[in-house]
């Protein structure tokens, strides 16, 4: 998605931001071009050189990321913030600024980090965004994220920024996701204004700035509420800058958070994750803003959270304009303070684990840390954990994260080493179909999980044992399921828990991971604020993972916060923030939610922040899950077979989303669901704006819905959410808020259940989790039907929770369900040489299990409708209505099915044909042939010789007759003078000669032929000899036997 694709609204925003950023300012103004350049630069130079060296082992595989540099992040954790810087787009202008933003530490790291991944995902626009980021510490943060995740995430985020742009963003997100998945796209992920639609960019910027500010002033600001506010303000301006960083570094959660608003949800998410992770990984890394750099562990996180909170608020308010001040002012801060760990945890889980995105990178921690403070907030919100604290801003981040995860996954993997890799693969395994997935797929890319980067574990890095249980769940969920418990990753145990959350970031495919993260989150993080989310009664508790509306709605929650300051507070308090979310949604555009839902999931959040589409954020998270990931796929680009997946939207959608339909236009929902179901990863995009509304609904409601409804809605909503991302955001901003709410709520319950469920899985999850589990399972089931991995996608509506749910399902309930659909992508292909005779079969060959499941369900529901057409009736006026069945146009083609039988009778390739090698007969073989003695006698030869004799006799007869004729003519001397006689004579003579010649030759041939029989005796002798021996030899072995 080049920056061109989206208007550079954010860019305009930048100037204010710039001020914050300082160096950034110029860049922002400059616009995409500069950003692009920077992107390129960072990507190429930094990414290639810096990143690469760093993480040779696994990260290289990370290459999957479109942004190789980021991959390079291989340097992984250590991810130097430098890469972050690059991310920022600082490259050109920001560079200096970035240092400013980050503390010295961060600065160091950033360079290397930046290249890591940040750059790749973002399109050129991202670059522009980078400039915005420029000044930001964010950038540095990002660099921490650089692992990979960040970039993708950021991208998404940015896109989400605008409701209308949503589609674009979605596209961008998808693209970016694709990039991430494929690793092909070079463009850095910088989430830049360019990337985002104008509106989105602006919003992102605002959101971002909050984060950014934090990063920059970080130490001072974060500590106090006042500082917080201040930071918020600053952030607003630098948001873009921040975001780019985000983009750059999924790892730096802090940065990401900021970014979310501005440019890429991805970055935003990243930011938060980074932050969260950072504390665990590298308190030191924490931004200067985090005074507690010392505490690698949670402490840092907490502070960061505070900062993040503030920041978040800011982003929120930017989106909301009026609200923002309030938001960021105290509420946000409080949130963070209260749940700061939560936010961090969310992000950190994966990150902390090892990757926390880059930040997590222990070595890189410095820069990461920087991001941490800011990011934490952001990311968390995305998931549920953060939702409360930094929801607004963070949420966007979360959104981003999903994508990011994809990118990150490789990085994270790296960071985590093998285990990490596994983690990521889980998400990735599904990813295979979708790019995102890819990310996960590349086991190298451990960072994926990091993407979530929920910091939750951050504060409880040591405290929680999330490591082990946390990761495992994730894996399960993913299906890939590398069950590596995060425990392996234990190093960042706290983060590990978060990691799960991190997973959320994953794209559709990674969604599962995300879920897992969440679950983990819940488990690992529960004790802390995360607990609140999943475990803590506090703010997050309500939703469980989802509780933090932030998580599910987390994303929206944040936006909500942003949009409504009080909502933000609400979030903190409620954790679930149901009300807050609702109000928010009503007030702000639910679209945000939607946007994020799909691959854009991450984006949505950022957008939310900016646009106050908080709900969307949540959804988004889930959405990415869609890819099932494998589905996955998460982004449309990532989706393995987007076209195929999109084929049956109507049918599939319908079946799944019962609840959704009522709230939103059935058709919007239906398609959306379809899409989501069909291809969690790719489908979403196709969904139109309407879907967005649906999505929105899902998300918003995510807070706490009816369990029953949740199930259905969940499934429906989640699917939609994935679809919505694109369409959702733009179209239903206003409508969704009020209308969707109910639906949303329903869905939310589902999410919550899901969320809860995961905790049960984790076992850490305290209470609520269990109940949700039931729902979750139900939800999962529908999902499963849709597609095993789908389980996750359905959750999307709940976004964070949902993912968890899905994970839980996958892990627990889904285990059973998976078999049928098991890994959709892994479905055994039909043997190539067997060509099905039925069209249906052929279709199945290309379709995934998920698809099939979807088809089944939807079909069952639809057929019923079709079977019972309206019966004829007579109305009050006596008018008789007879149902007329619309007749399809008459076509010969309609009944034509391409039978593939022809393939059976034609060679498809050279290897299908092989020349038969004739076997040379041995004497024994010849001797043992039937009638060999008869043949030796030469009867055929004699027969032929007799016939030749007849020919000779015939020729002789002709010769004699010609002689007589000639003799009759010659005597007359007139022949010489008579031309005719002369000619006849000549002819006779010629014929006589021919007869002689033929007779001689035939005789000769006959003699030669008969000579063959001269050896008859000898041949018979040999044959009798060898023939006998052969028979004996055949008999002997039998005797021996």
From Swiss-Prot:
Assigned keywords, A-Z: Nucleus, Repressor, Transcription, Transcription regulation
Subcellular location: Nucleus
Gene Ontology annotations of biological process type: negative regulation of transcription by RNA polymerase II
InterPro entries to which the protein is assigned, alphabetical: His_deAcase_cplx_SAP130, SAP130_C
Ranges annotated as biased composition (Polar residues): 18-30, 614-641
Renumbered residue ranges of the record's region Disordered: 1-62, 111-131, 572-592, 614-769, 806-852
Pfam families attached to this UniProt entry: SAP130_C (PF16014)
Biased composition regions of type Basic and acidic residues, renumbered to the chain: 33-42
Family per record: Belongs to the SAP130 family.
Entry function: Acts as a transcriptional repressor.
PANTHER family linked: HISTONE DEACETYLASE COMPLEX SUBUNIT SAP130 (PTHR13497:SF3)
The protein's name: Histone deacetylase complex subunit SAP130-B
Gene source species: Xenopus laevis
Gene: sap130-b
